[in-house]
UniProtKB/Swiss-Prot annotation:
Molecular function GO labels: aspartate 1-decarboxylase activity
Cofactor: pyruvate
Protein's recorded name: Aspartate 1-decarboxylase
SUBUNIT field: Heterooctamer of four alpha and four beta subunits.
Keyword tags: Autocatalytic cleavage, Cytoplasm, Decarboxylase, Lyase, Pantothenate biosynthesis, Pyruvate, Schiff base, Zymogen
Length: 128
């Protein structure tokens, strides 16, 4: 039996754009995708810290170093520029694989530049 675990997370990214008339997805700076181990076109969950909305979409790689976080299509209705979001990808694995698994957690500043990366997260404690 497989279970689903967090595989990659970009924590408290700042929305830089919202493009309602685009076909869909979230555009994310490729540097952030790589750091979090999230692939282009991978399904992600986006949580808007400002309004509590949680949505699913897929990723599109944005220009490296651009800091872009752009909600596209219908998802653009759920965020405004400057909102803070958490972007999470999940992976299915066996229980044996899960016991050894460590997620990639990426923290960013207000300009979506990486400030810290870790592979461990526990309530009240983050270990690098």
């Amino acid at each position: 039996m497989n279970i689903t675990l967090l595989s990659g997370k970009i924590h408290r990214a700042t929305v830089t754009q919202a493009e309602l008339n685009y076909v869909g997805s979230i555009t994310i700076d490729q540097d952030l995708l790589e750091a979090a181990g999230i692939m282009e076109y991978e399904k992600v969950c986006v949580v808007n810290i400002n309004n509590g909305i949680r949505l699913e979409t897929y990723t599109i790689a944005g220009e490296k170093g651009s800091g872009i976080i752009c909600l596209n299509g219908a998802a653009a209705r759920y965020a405004q520029v400057s909102d803070k979001v958490i972007i999470m990808a999940y992976a299915q694995m066996t229980k044996e694989e899960a016991q050894k698994h460590k997620p990639n957690v990426v923290f960013v500043d207000d300009n979506n530049r990486i400030t810290r990366k870790t592979n461990y997260e526990k309530h009240g404690q983050i270990v690098e």
